[in-house]
Amino acid sequence: MSPNFKLQCHFILILLTALRGESRYLEVQEAAVYDPLLLFSANLKRDLAEEQPYRRALRCLDMLSLPGQFTFTADRPQLHCAAFFIGEPEEFITIHYDLVSIDCQGGDFLKVFDGWILKGEKFPSSQDHPLPTMKRYTDFCESGLTRRSIRSSQNVAMVFFRVHEPGNGFTITIKTDPNLFPCNVISQTPSGRFTLVVPYQHQNCSFSIIYPVAIKISDLTLGHLHGLQLKKPAAGCGGTGDFVELLGGTGLDPSKMMPLADLCYPFLGPAQMKISCDNAVVRMVSSGKHINRVTFEYRQLEPFELETSTGNSIPEYCLSSL
């Protein structure tokens, strides 16, 4: 794993509304604004010790990017806690309950969410994830140890928990498994190269980069039909079933971002765009009739580029919120 996994601090705020629900499920509230509980450290990568497996205590607000065994023990009532987990793009994350000692009847809870929720927004979005939002939660207080292991649908997952009684808590083991066709991804790094392949599947896939970046698309293959590529549509991509769009915004949910460009015909690049937003997304929409593929490189914009963005970048929309 790369040692320089960093996220914009204001993107890692856990809203009180995501943790203070009275129901058994956590509701995503889009409009409310709350003060953050805490900012995560800018340097989130943990050094992997030579001993295996890696073990350490889990904090009330935490982020981890490597497998291991993690134990949370309350030293006082901890009512608004969340742990974020992220793997490599080509990995699933499995969360296994080793030991759980919480008081469900007394208001404690321990819930796994398939994806991330930040500032009331979800990744993957409801449009991109195969399950409805409520099905993406696994509540220990409902299932108990009958379901000891929960595997994510992508390279990110998170745990919400509340523990009232000091001394209570839980131990979980985080493992990763290979994902041959990663669909929805949050990048651990501000620069890299990736090929997104969707083979004959009717689904939407988003690759999220939580930095202002320059994206260069070097290869795009869409709509192979009997060995021939579909012709370029007369106008726009709205009428096609297979296309790639570039999105930008200040939140995490791709469905709430601004479309900056769309591509719906094959080409051999390069095509480049600077996206000055806090979050940039390469999103592929597939009809399921073809094998679609897009290869792209991305790098974080330098400060001087943010100040002097011109040409085919989109500074007006994004920089106003920085």
Curated annotation (Swiss-Prot):
SUPFAM superfamilies xrefs: Spermadhesin, CUB domain
GO molecular function, one term: corticotropin-releasing hormone binding
Disulfide bond residue pairs: 60-81, 104-141, 183-205, 237-264, 277-318
Glycosylated residues in this chain: 204
Biological processes per GO annotation: behavioral response to ethanol; cellular response to calcium ion; cellular response to cAMP; cellular response to cocaine; cellular response to estradiol stimulus; cellular response to estrogen stimulus; cellular response to gonadotropin-releasing hormone; cellular response to immobilization stress
Signal peptide (residue range): 1-24
Keywords of this entry: Disulfide bond, Glycoprotein, Secreted, Signal
Protein family (similarity comment): Belongs to the CRF-binding protein family.
Role this protein plays: Binds CRF and inactivates it. May prevent inappropriate pituitary-adrenal stimulation in pregnancy.
Protein name as annotated: Corticotropin-releasing factor-binding protein
Species, as recorded: Mus musculus (Mouse)
